[in-house]
Design a protein with these regions (language model features):
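Active-site proximal loop and beta-alpha junction motif in alpha/beta enzyme cores
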Residues: 2-92, 98-177
Length: 177
């Protein structure tokens, strides 16, 4: 085994204080890539689109419902974060965000007295995490909801197996749907 084939990742059980309970998420804390020292290999920059297939491969190998990759954004106090299932990148994952914050505080990368600001890779949403009274408070952005009408609404009703005799008062989607 060569040193470049050794990678550290965390498995965090979110929403619980009990081992093997809650909702597990994988977390990898990556360097920013300035020195070539990252979690993704010697020359892989986590903010480079060319590394997305590597992140996808790692998430498939970890094989949890979601794996979060996070790194300190260049020239910023924020942390970038991307989320992958074993098969696809997703825009947002609450329990993986919680898990990433827990790892950053627990490893000492961020003092527990400081809030963490994450910026998502898909959609560029800002997420904030802070420790308050021994619990993690997460603040997610409000999303603008748009009404779903016409053919799109009919497709949605069909997907749920609902017929015309079901009264739907409204259907909405967010900007990332």
């Amino acid at each position: 085994m060569t040193p470049s084939s050794i990678t550290t990742y965390y498995v965090v059980d979110a929403f619980t204080s009990e081992p093997f309970a809650g909702n597990a998420a994988g977390v990898m804390v990556c360097g920013g890539g300035e020195t070539g020292d990252t979690c993704l290999g010697p020359l892989a920059r986590p903010d480079d689109p060319a590394t997305l297939p590597i992140m996808q491969q790692v998430a498939a190998e970890v094989n949890l419902s979601e794996t979060a990759f996070t790194w300190k954004a260049a020239g910023s106090a924020e942390y970038a974060i991307r989320y992958f299932t074993p098969t696809v990148e997703i825009a947002l994952c609450g329990h993986a965000t919680l898990a990433a914050a827990k790892v950053l505080w627990g490893s000492g990368a961020v003092p527990s007295s400081e809030a963490i600001v994450f910026r998502t890779g898909v959609g560029g949403q800002e997420l904030r995490c802070a420790l308050e009274g021994g619990r993690i408070k997460m603040v997610f952005p409000d999303d603008q909801l748009d009404a779903v009408e016409g053919e799109e609404k009919a497709e949605l009703l069909s997907a749920f197996g609902w017929s015309g005799d079901v009264l739907v008062l409204g259907a909405y989607k967010g900007r990332l749907n």
